[in-house]
Amino acid sequence: MPQEQYTHHRSTMPGSVGPQVYKVGIYGWRKRCLYFFVLLLMILILVNLAMTIWILKVMNFTIDGMGNLRITEKGLKLEGDSEFLQPLYAKEIQSRPGNALYFKSARNVTVNILNDQTKVLTQLITGPKAVEAYGKKFEVKTVSGKLLFSADNNEVVVGAERLRVLGAEGTVFPKSIETPNVRADPFKELRLESPTRSLVMEAPKGVEINAEAGNMEATCRTELRLESKDGEIKLDAAKIRLPRLPHGSYTPTGTRQKVFEICVCANGRLFLSQAGAGSTCQINTSVCL
C-alpha cells in the first residue's frame, strides 16, 4: 500500500525540535498475507467461472431448456431417452406425433391411480414374468368404443363376434356356461366331453345340434336315452337303421311273456301293439289319428 506521511507541527516553544513524520499503512507479513488472499480470491473466481461455463456446455443449457428437456407453452418436452430415478407425477404423458411411447425398466413398470387421500384405486404392474392389473373392473374396447372383454367380481363378458380357443386340450369349464351358439371352425371337429362327470345341455326354448357337412355321433358306455316329456321325438331321414337289435327265439312251452310289435303310421309315428299270431297293427289304428 502506498505509504502515507503526515507531518505534525507542534506549537512553537522554546527548546522544541523540528517537525516529526508518522508512517501509516500495512507492512511486513500482513501485507504479504493480504496479497495472497487477494490472489487466491481471483483464482477461485476464475475456477468458478470456468466450472460454470463447463457445466453449461455439458448440460447443454439454452434459452428454451436444458439438454433434451425443452420448456414449451404446453409443458415440458423431452427428446430421446429419459431416465427418472424418483417417482414422476404428471397429468399427461404423450409421445412425439407419429412416434411410439416406450416405457423401459430393468424390473417392472408400475402405474398407480390414486385418490385425494393418496390411496391406490387401480394398479397396473408389468413385470418380467406376468402382467397384473388390480381394480374393480377390467375392460378392453375397440377404437370405436365397442366392448371386447370385461371382467369384474360378478361376471366375465366377451363381446367379440367369435371366441376361439387354440389350445390342444381345448377349454375346461369347472362350472356351468351360458352361450347361444357352440361351433367348431370349418372342416374341424367339435367335441364336448366330460371325462369323469356328466354333460348336461339345457335351454328353455330348445337345444339344436346340427352337422351341415358331416356326420354326428353320440357314443356312450352304458345307456343312451332320448326323452321328451311333453312333445315327441322325430327321426327324419330317408333311411333309419337299427342293425344290432336282438333276435328272439321261439319257445312253445313255458311262461307266456308279453311281446309287442312295432307299428308305423302313415305320418311316421311309431307305436307298440300286442303281438299275436298275425299282425295286430290294423287293430290299433286309432293311435295314428
UniProtKB/Swiss-Prot annotation:
Disease implicated: Muscular dystrophy, limb-girdle, autosomal recessive 6: An autosomal recessive degenerative myopathy initially affecting the proximal limb girdle musculature. Muscle from patients shows a complete loss of delta-sarcoglycan as well as of the others components of the sarcoglycan complex. Cardiomyopathy, dilated, 1L: A disorder characterized by ventricular dilation and impaired systolic function, resulting in congestive heart failure and arrhythmia. Patients are at risk of premature death.
Tissue note: Most strongly expressed in skeletal and cardiac muscle. Also detected in smooth muscle. Weak expression in brain and lung.
Membrane topology: Single-pass type II membrane protein
Presence of keyword Nucleus: no
Primary localization: membrane
Glycosylation site residues: N60, N108, N284
Family membership: Belongs to the sarcoglycan beta/delta/gamma/zeta family.
Chain ranges passing through the membrane: 36-56
Task performed by this protein: Component of the sarcoglycan complex, a subcomplex of the dystrophin-glycoprotein complex which forms a link between the F-actin cytoskeleton and the extracellular matrix.
Residue spans, topological domain Extracellular: 57-289
Keyword line: Cardiomyopathy, Cell membrane, Cytoplasm, Cytoskeleton, Disease variant, Disulfide bond, Glycoprotein, Limb-girdle muscular dystrophy, Membrane, Signal-anchor, Transmembrane, Transmembrane helix
Covalent S-S links between cysteines: C263-C288, C265-C281
The organism's place on the tree of life at top rank: Eukaryota
A Pfam match: Sarcoglycan_1
Subcellular location field: Cell membrane, Sarcolemma; Cytoplasm, Cytoskeleton
Topological domains, Cytoplasmic: 1-35
Modification after translation: Glycosylated.
Keyword DNA-binding: no
GO biological process: calcium ion homeostasis; calcium-mediated signaling; cardiac muscle cell contraction; cardiac muscle cell development; cardiac muscle tissue development; coronary vasculature morphogenesis; heart contraction; muscle organ development
GO cellular component: cytoskeleton; dystrophin-associated glycoprotein complex; endoplasmic reticulum membrane; Golgi membrane; plasma membrane; sarcoglycan complex; sarcolemma; sarcoplasmic reticulum
PANTHER family with a match to the protein in the record: DELTA-SARCOGLYCAN (PTHR12939:SF6), SARCOGLYCAN (PTHR12939)
Summary of subunit composition and partner proteins: Interacts with FLNC and DAG1. Cross-link to form 2 major subcomplexes: one consisting of SGCB, SGCD and SGCG and the other consisting of SGCB and SGCD. The association between SGCB and SGCG is particularly strong while SGCA is loosely associated with the other sarcoglycans.
Name listed for the protein in its UniProt record: Delta-sarcoglycan
Source organism: Homo sapiens (Human)
